[in-house]
Amino acid sequence: MEQRISLITLGVADLRRAAAFYERVIGWKAESSPPGVVFFALNGVVFGLWPHDELAKDMGTTSDGVSAYRGYALAHNVRSEAEVDAIFGRLKEHGATILKQPQKAFWGGYSGYFSDPDGHTWEIAYNPFWTIQQDGRVSMKKE
């Protein structure tokens, strides 16, 4: 298996609301998608939104028992602490729950956590040891 992730799909309660959240708050643009799912192209990785029940059915399970803590966090790295703060400034008015306000992190960066309207946990982070290329790709080396 090659070392990459091609698609990350989140189960959501309200597809229209979830798509609007990622478009308005995060600033992503949805791609042309089949009915009932929304895709965003993110520099080689596709990010998808699909209703909980449909995703569970596709996985051969049910969507019962979705808990608040799911044992993961998705992360979006930005180019400055100010950019972290700007994103957090928009979150609450669009249905996000702030889990941890942005602050200096033990690893030398600056980050905060929120959950989107469907409870998916996100970290918005500035890592001074990584470089974000012009096209948005992240390099784990400072250039």
Predicted region positions:
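A short acidic/small-residue loop/turn micro-motif
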Residues: 54, 106-107, 128-131
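A short, acidic/glycine-rich surface segment
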Residues: 55-61, 131-134
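Conserved acetyl-CoA-binding loop of GNAT-fold acetyltransferases
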Residues: 24-30, 96-97, 120, 124
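Core segments of cupin and vicinal oxygen chelate
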Residues: 9-56
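Vicinal oxygen chelate
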Residues: 12-16, 74-117
